[in-house]
Amino acid sequence: MADAKAQKRQKFDNVFPKLREELLAYLNQEGMPQDAVSWFQRNLDYNVPGGKLNRGISVVDSVEILKGRKLNDDEYFKAALLGWCVEFLQAFFLVSDDMMDQSVTRRGQPCWFRVEGINLIAINDSFMLEGAIYYLLKKHFRSEPYYVHLLELFHDTTFQTEIGQLIDLITAPEDHVDLSKFSLAKHQKIVIYKTAYYSFYLPVALAMYTCGVPHAPANDPYALAQSILIPLGEYFQVQDDFLDFAAPPEVLGKVGTDIVDNKCSWCVNAALARASPAQRRVLDDNYGLKDKEAEARVKALYEELGIRDEFAAYEERAYARIVGLIETIPAEGADVGAGDVRLKREVFKAFLDKIYKRQK
């Protein structure tokens, strides 16, 4: 199983150098100076590969499930290219996000803007990662009937993510703690816009367009997919927030920092919803401080308030809700109405199985 997963990743990884060469060839063809070409190559190599690649690989997985067969070389390349475009989008977000948050490390290495000699040039570097998406889409998909849908999908998703980022930045600035701005409703808004659209809806919608799934005036398959994937993305982020507090660092692979970073996390919002006035004071006095003892006091309060049990109950509710939504997709072999295009439950089950009760 692990071997199959490693092979799948390797096959996906092998597409990246081809895309990098196309992008660098474009700069060379435009007569750009060699130092600019080298800089762009370094930007690409440092920021695009190297993550978990879940978003990118899920485009390929979804195309395979929708087609119901192995992909030929051309189909695989096109699906992987779209997957890599999602990874380019993620890189664009992360490079700029790290600057806004003044983060120190990302994926076990210094954030790009902290690399010697980069500094604020990282702003333009992030723009170039975004621009690369549209160069690749035009080069490989311009003649496809769904090309405009791909463009709109990337543009819409980018704007949605930026709106989510704005709400997050003004709700929870690192240098000014004001828990009165926090609420579970606001947390939900941030999560849906900042994470769920680009991490969950985008990869599946890309797969649907490539497989020729059309929009429909009634029972639109894209609206149906979104109605399942947005709650799925919300559940994923709540899980992420909980693991930041509850998972041991050696399992999580990093040290959780949501408390000291004043993050508008599900945990603090769940605590605020349950806290007595005295407990609320503990949160007000200790949350968002760069102080180990203050962090320990917040964690102790989470334990006292039963945040672990609260999360376990949330997880079961979320799972049951998402399973129920998936079951609204007609089962294979069932009759579908005229004009309805068959979505496959398996696309969504694959996502849910990957994240249900995960430990990291």
Curated annotation (Swiss-Prot):
Residues where Mg(2+) 2 binds: D97, D101
Pathway: Isoprenoid biosynthesis; farnesyl diphosphate biosynthesis; farnesyl diphosphate from geranyl diphosphate and isopentenyl diphosphate: step 1/1; Isoprenoid biosynthesis; geranyl diphosphate biosynthesis; geranyl diphosphate from dimethylallyl diphosphate and isopentenyl diphosphate: step 1/1
CDD domains (UniProt xref): Trans_IPPS_HT (cd00685)
Binding site for isopentenyl diphosphate: K52, R55, Q90, R107
Entry keyword annotation includes Repeat: no
Residues bound to Mg(2+) 1: D97, D101
Protein name: Farnesyl pyrophosphate synthase
Organism this protein belongs to: Ganoderma lucidum
